[in-house]
């Protein structure tokens, strides 16, 4: 039997985690050839993924939050090989919010998350390809704009380390009453929307910003992206955002949002618009976002809510 070869790409912020260290030791004891690489700066994930492919690794394990997952997935997506010819992808949730992992039902314990590699045949999943004023990006989970993006971008790193997802809520409450709507034009196949919005979600996955379920019905294997637009609500803004922060976005979105499910979406804004791509703020006036079906293969739990079949 061939020895399993896994490569762990670990966000440097979690390098001292004892549970992860124990999990690595456990799987090495089970006969897995498991090497660890730690990211400290931009470009590390790309370099480590290329190295893993050159070494013939079977599985690349991203250990970190949504940004780490996205960085590894983006590097795989940039490759010329098809998904079947690339290493499969696994995730150990170790970020602040872990939005993708939460929605997918991936265990938070490192040893259990590692176990999915052996228990679950990898599924082909979609990724979002984003063109921002001519520059290409990839997004594994969700692109968001408006209020949620401002909260995520402006939340203090120290606060996130101390309070986890609660830090986003505190920052959001502090910003209530200071939210300026964004004017944009959105278009896609048989879809057009123009006006002022306070929140925008384009989902491969379902949630971002520490649990904001902007695209609650999104699937990562349907070849489509889910769009949710929350328009400007004039005098109701503060009350509505307060409800979203206290009880989650679901109730407010059901009544107020415009939704669509599309293979691609174009966004045009007269002023520079910031989209948060899995934690990476990207600013442009013109965006084109496409769902690329089955771009990578990922180990996910049985009954994963993000899979349609």
Swiss-Prot record:
<comment type="function">
    <text>Probably phosphorylates lipids; the in vivo substrate is unknown.</text>
</comment>
<dbReference type="GO" id="GO:0005524">
    <property type="term" value="F:ATP binding"/>
</dbReference>
<keyword id="KW-0594">Phospholipid biosynthesis</keyword>
<keyword id="KW-0547">Nucleotide-binding</keyword>
<keyword id="KW-0067">ATP-binding</keyword>
<dbReference type="InterPro" id="IPR001206">
    <property type="entry name" value="Diacylglycerol_kinase_cat_dom"/>
</dbReference>
<feature type="binding site">
    <location>
        <begin position="65"/>
        <end position="71"/>
    </location>
    <ligand>
        <name>ATP</name>
    </ligand>
</feature>
<keyword id="KW-0808">Transferase</keyword>
<dbReference type="InterPro" id="IPR045540">
    <property type="entry name" value="YegS/DAGK_C"/>
</dbReference>
<feature type="binding site">
    <location>
        <position position="39"/>
    </location>
    <ligand>
        <name>ATP</name>
    </ligand>
</feature>
<keyword id="KW-0443">Lipid metabolism</keyword>
<dbReference type="InterPro" id="IPR016064">
    <property type="entry name" value="NAD/diacylglycerol_kinase_sf"/>
</dbReference>
<keyword id="KW-1208">Phospholipid metabolism</keyword>
<dbReference type="InterPro" id="IPR022433">
    <property type="entry name" value="Lip_kinase_YegS"/>
</dbReference>
<keyword id="KW-0479">Metal-binding</keyword>
<feature type="binding site">
    <location>
        <position position="224"/>
    </location>
    <ligand>
        <name>Mg(2+)</name>
    </ligand>
</feature>
<dbReference type="InterPro" id="IPR017438">
    <property type="entry name" value="ATP-NAD_kinase_N"/>
</dbReference>
<feature type="binding site">
    <location>
        <position position="222"/>
    </location>
    <ligand>
        <name>Mg(2+)</name>
    </ligand>
</feature>
<comment type="similarity">
    <text>Belongs to the diacylglycerol/lipid kinase family. YegS lipid kinase subfamily.</text>
</comment>
<dbReference type="GO" id="GO:0005886">
    <property type="term" value="C:plasma membrane"/>
</dbReference>
<dbReference type="Pfam" id="PF00781">
    <property type="entry name" value="DAGK_cat"/>
</dbReference>
<dbReference type="GO" id="GO:0005737">
    <property type="term" value="C:cytoplasm"/>
</dbReference>
<feature type="domain" description="DAGKc">
    <location>
        <begin position="1"/>
        <end position="134"/>
    </location>
</feature>
<protein>
    <recommendedName>
        <fullName>Probable lipid kinase YegS-like</fullName>
        <ecNumber>2.7.1.-</ecNumber>
    </recommendedName>
</protein>
<dbReference type="GO" id="GO:0000287">
    <property type="term" value="F:magnesium ion binding"/>
</dbReference>
<feature type="binding site">
    <location>
        <position position="96"/>
    </location>
    <ligand>
        <name>ATP</name>
    </ligand>
</feature>
<keyword id="KW-0418">Kinase</keyword>
<feature type="active site" description="Proton acceptor">
    <location>
        <position position="280"/>
    </location>
</feature>
<keyword id="KW-0460">Magnesium</keyword>
<dbReference type="InterPro" id="IPR005218">
    <property type="entry name" value="Diacylglycerol/lipid_kinase"/>
</dbReference>
<feature type="binding site">
    <location>
        <position position="219"/>
    </location>
    <ligand>
        <name>Mg(2+)</name>
    </ligand>
</feature>
<dbReference type="GO" id="GO:0001727">
    <property type="term" value="F:lipid kinase activity"/>
</dbReference>
<dbReference type="GO" id="GO:0008654">
    <property type="term" value="P:phospholipid biosynthetic process"/>
</dbReference>
<keyword id="KW-0963">Cytoplasm</keyword>
<dbReference type="Pfam" id="PF19279">
    <property type="entry name" value="YegS_C"/>
</dbReference>
<dbReference type="InterPro" id="IPR050187">
    <property type="entry name" value="Lipid_Phosphate_FormReg"/>
</dbReference>
<keyword id="KW-0444">Lipid biosynthesis</keyword>
């Amino acid at each position: 039997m061939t020895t399993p070869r896994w490569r762990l790409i670990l966000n440097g912020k979690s390098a001292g985690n004892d549970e992860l260290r124990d999990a690595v030791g456990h799987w090495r004891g089970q006969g897995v050839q498991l090497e660890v690489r730690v990211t400290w700066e931009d470009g590390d994930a790309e370099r480590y993924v290329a190295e893993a492919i050159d070494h013939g690794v079977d599985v690349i394990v991203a250990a970190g939050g949504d940004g780490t997952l996205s960085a590894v997935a983006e590097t795989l997506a940039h490759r010329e090989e098809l998904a079947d010819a690339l290493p499969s992808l696994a995730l150990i949730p170790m970020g602040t919010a872990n939005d993708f992992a939460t929605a997918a039902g991936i265990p938070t314990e490192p040893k259990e998350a590692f176990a999915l590699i052996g228990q679950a045949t990898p599924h082909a999943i979609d990724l979002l390809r984003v063109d921002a004023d001519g520059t290409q990006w990839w997004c594994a989970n969700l692109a968001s704009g408006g209020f949620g993006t401002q909260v995520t971008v402006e939340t203090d790193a120290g606060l996130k380390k101390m309070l986890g997802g609660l830090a986003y809520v505190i920052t959001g409450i502090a910003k209530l009453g200071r939210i300026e709507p964004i004017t944009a034009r959105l278009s896609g196949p048989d879809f057009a929307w123009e006006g002022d919005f306070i929140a925008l979600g384009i989902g491969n996955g379902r949630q971002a910003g520490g649990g904001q379920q902007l695209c609650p019905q999104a699937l990562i294997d349907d070849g489509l992206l889910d769009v949710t637009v929350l328009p400007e609500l004039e005098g109701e803004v503060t009350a509505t955002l307060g409800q979203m922060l206290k009880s989650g976005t679901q109730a407010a979105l059901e009544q107020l949002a415009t939704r669509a499910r599309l293979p691609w979406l174009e966004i045009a804004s007269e002023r520079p618009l910031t989209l948060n791509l899995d934690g990476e703020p990207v600013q442009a006036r013109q965006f084109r976002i496409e769902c690329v079906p089955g771009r990578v293969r990922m180990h996910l739990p049985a009954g994963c809510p993000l899979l349609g079949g």
